[in-house]
Regions:
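Conserved redox-active cysteine motifs that mediate thiol-disulfide chemistry
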Residues: 38, 46-63
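Structural microenvironment flanking redox-active thiols in thiol-disulfide oxidoreductases
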Residues: 56-95, 106-113
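Thiol/disulfide oxidoreductase modules built on the thioredoxin-like
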Residues: 90-99, 105-151
Length: 154
């Protein structure tokens, strides 16, 4: 895996990885399957309310969803802290998050599937539904280098 010039924490896979049955829940406990979003650039951000770096990066991730240059992007912030929806909603309100809603993985199946070592970890999935890169730890998602790079996948 190669490091992206100018941005720490990004790991790019030489060969994109396929993950089957990437399923998680929305706030109404409805199942979301990423296969339904083939053709979109997907960002799965794994986080928890007690995670300070998650709190720092979430507003920039929220702005990324609203970026007009990235019309094919769909961001799923997936809580893997086994936290209540009240706690999660308060976290989003406190941070003034406007452009996406929280999602949940209560059994933390995805943490195992993606071999997550900690939060935040962000998985980047191309339009074919394959993981092509990941961010280990937090970054500023409004960083120009990041946006110029991610635009190529939009």
């Amino acid at each position: 895996a190669e490091e992206l010039p100018g941005i720490k924490n990004i790991v790019i896979h030489k060969i994109p990885k396929t993950h089957d049955n990437v399923i998680f829940l929305d706030k109404n406990d409805q199942k979301i399957n990423i296969n339904e979003y083939t053709g979109n650039l997907l960002i799965l951000n794994f986080w928890a309310t007690w995670c300070e770096p998650c709190k720092e990066e979430m507003p920039s991730l929220d702005k990324l969803q609203a970026n007009p240059e990235l019309d094919k992007i769909k961001i799923f912030p997936i809580n893997i802290g086994k936290e209540t929806s009240n706690k999660v909603n308060k976290f989003f309100i406190d941070l003034n998050i406007k452009n996406f809603e929280p999602y949940f993985d209560p059994p933390t199946t995805l943490a195992k599937m993606f071999s997550l070592r900690g939060v935040p970890t962000t998985i980047l999935i191309n339009k074919k539904g394959q993981e092509f890169a990941r961010v280990i730890g937090s970054i500023d998602f409004e960083d120009k280098n990041f946006i110029n790079w991610i635009k190529k996948y939009n």
